[in-house]
Amino acid sequence: MANIKSAKKRAVTSEKRRKHNASRRSMMRTFIKKVYAAIATGDKAAAQNAFNEMQPLVDRQAAKGLIHKNKAARHKANLTAQISKMA
């Protein structure tokens, strides 16, 4: 454990941010899983609705630096391709 006052504060702040980021990342993954689940059921309308809910959330997390912008783009591109392949 840190001995210097500023290092102690950084440790506390860092842990607080880690928990906050973990929560945001978990929420984002849940929304992505909802899209995959909708695709698995074969319901294109439900998949599109789930994607429309997921897209701004992923973009926001990328803009805030939680994930890299290319990772956000990759998720969106893969899911869009899978949805468009549906009958």
From Swiss-Prot:
Cross-referenced Gene3D superfamilies, in alphabetical order? Answer: Ribosomal protein S20
Q: Which GO terms describe its biological process?
A: translation
Does the keyword Ribosomal protein belong to this entry?
yes
**Cellular component aspect of the GO annotation:** cytosol; small ribosomal subunit
Q: Where is this region: Disordered?
A: 1-27
Keywords on this record? Ribonucleoprotein, Ribosomal protein, RNA-binding, rRNA-binding
Q: Does the keyword Ribosomal protein apply?
A: yes
Q: Which GO terms describe its molecular function?
A: small ribosomal subunit rRNA binding; structural constituent of ribosome
Q: What does this protein do?
A: Binds directly to 16S ribosomal RNA.
Q: Which family does it belong to?
A: Belongs to the bacterial ribosomal protein bS20 family.
Matches recorded under NCBIfam families: S20
Fetch the HAMAP family from UniProt.
Ribosomal_bS20
Q: State the protein's name.
A: Small ribosomal subunit protein bS20
